[in-house]
């Protein structure tokens, strides 16, 4: 069984770091579920942010404390996320674009980690929709693979 696109979907493994697209994680509940699932057996570098639509982000704090190595914040509500999550004790970094976020995640992740795009926010501040956001993420992972000299047969394929 292959999962639905953009719903905790593995994109690639590059140098023992797995890149996972959960662009459909457009609200806090979905992102909490993704963090708990992916974090069950490894640490996460999490890309979070976008248009939060006035959600309460505080329920992200505990799973982030438990499973997340670093946060990379993007989009309109990055500052609000930073304010709510600053007590979580997890390093936070800002990225101007999703492409920059993927590059930054590569430098923050350690062997065996996952880089997870699960933004807990709508995409409309930077993208047409969550599908577009997921496609930009996948393309950024493809570009990273090329920069590392790694040939990916197809996205969704696992290469090391």
Q: How would you label these PLM feature ranges?
A:
Residues 17-18, 123-127:
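A short acidic, helix-capping loop that chelates divalent metal ions and anchors anionic groups
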Residues 1-19, 82-85, 138, 148-153, ...:
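Acidic, Mg2+-coordinating active-site environments of NTP-dependent enzymes
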């Amino acid at each position: 069984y292959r999962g639905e696109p953009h719903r905790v979907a593995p994109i690639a493994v590059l140098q023992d770091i797995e890149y996972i697209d959960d662009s459909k994680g457009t609200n806090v509940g979905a992102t909490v579920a993704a963090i708990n699932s992916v974090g069950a057996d490894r640490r996460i570098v999490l890309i979070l942010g976008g248009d939060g639509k006035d959600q309460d982000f505080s329920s992200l704090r505990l799973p982030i404390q438990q499973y997340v190595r670093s946060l990379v914040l993007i989009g309109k509500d990055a500052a609000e996320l930073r304010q709510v999550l600053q007590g979580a004790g997890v390093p936070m970094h800002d990225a101007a674009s999703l492409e920059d976020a993927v590059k930054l995640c590569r430098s923050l992740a350690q062997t065996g980690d996952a880089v997870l795009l699960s933004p807990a926010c709508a995409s409309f501040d930077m993208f047409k929709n969550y599908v577009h956001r997921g496609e930009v993420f996948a393309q950024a992972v493809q570009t990273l693979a090329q920069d590392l000299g790694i040939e990916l047969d197809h996205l969704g394929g696992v290469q090391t």
